[in-house]
Amino acid sequence: MLAEGVTTHTFVQKGIYNMIFESIKKLVTYGLESGLIEESDRVYTTNRLLEALDLEEYDEPAEEFSDVDLESTLKELLDYAVEKGLTENSIVYRDLFDTKLMGLLTPRPSEVDTKFWGLYNHQSAKVATDYFYKLSQDTDYIRRYRVKKDMRWIAPTEYGDLDITINLSKPEKDPKAIAAAKLAKQSGYPKCLLCYENVGYAGRVNSPARQNHRVISLKINGTDWGLQYSPYVYYNEHCILFNKKHTPMVIDRSAFEKLFDFVRQFPHYFIGSNADLPIVGGSILSHEHFQGGHYSFAMAKAPVEEKIVFKGFENVDAGIVKWPMSVIRINSEDKNALV
């Protein structure tokens, strides 16, 4: 028999709150396990999550959690947010909301920069990028549970073993979100998806949320650039190096100087550039950027079929590579000669 003033609805509501409190505790535990937050951040982070979920009270569950599964925990929180009308039930809006939640666990940009360069200067460039790559996954900027759905295999050919990938981690927009994007107010901020102003941006229906996005600030040939990872990971440690100034792609002598300056600082990475041409070139020609990573492609392993000599550059080894498209490989210990 129910006590006076207590209804079945009361028990249902209490059950819902107990479940959401468990999900909040699991997410905070995930932050602690992954090193995103410290023990002294526990109460602060819990309160920030309560605010985001429009909750004014919290009764901490007695159960302790470990090895928290991030995808299922976020799903629990998202389902609650949808039920309470805090967000719409589509992949675009759910992504906007869970990125907001993960942003509450993500260290400040200055903290990430300080940690990165501390590791770089006192240990090595590789230790620094290992830290940053793990952070970019732990914050859910790179969604591991989506990336693992990608299809990858090796195809033996006369040109060597080719890497074939089908990227399935980039979510398809649902019709409702597409319609909403058409009606949404057009904004010039950030100017594009590569701009530094994306760091911490809340996003909107036609622009992804980036509260959990972090960028390493560095100098390339004396100018301000940023280093980030691609959220879609086409290959291992797929990184993007971009000019902090929104300036168009141009392939000229200075572009090659910038590429060499990057590999000087990060010798364990490769770096390359798309063409600065529409359609056949990069997808964002309005913003100067290069792409790199910790990977060896089949073209880099392909043999030279025919050696060639460039007059005046006898200190440069050059040759035509055995490849289905026109490729010339140049190699020298003299960086200036290569440029």
Regions found by a protein language model. Give the residues of each.
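Hydrophobic faces of well-ordered beta-strands that scaffold small-molecule active sites
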Residues: 227, 271, 288-290
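Short, Lys/Arg-enriched N-terminal segments with co-localized hydrophobic residues
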Residues: 5-18
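Conserved His + Asp/Glu catalytic blocks
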Residues: 250, 270-271, 277-283, 294-339
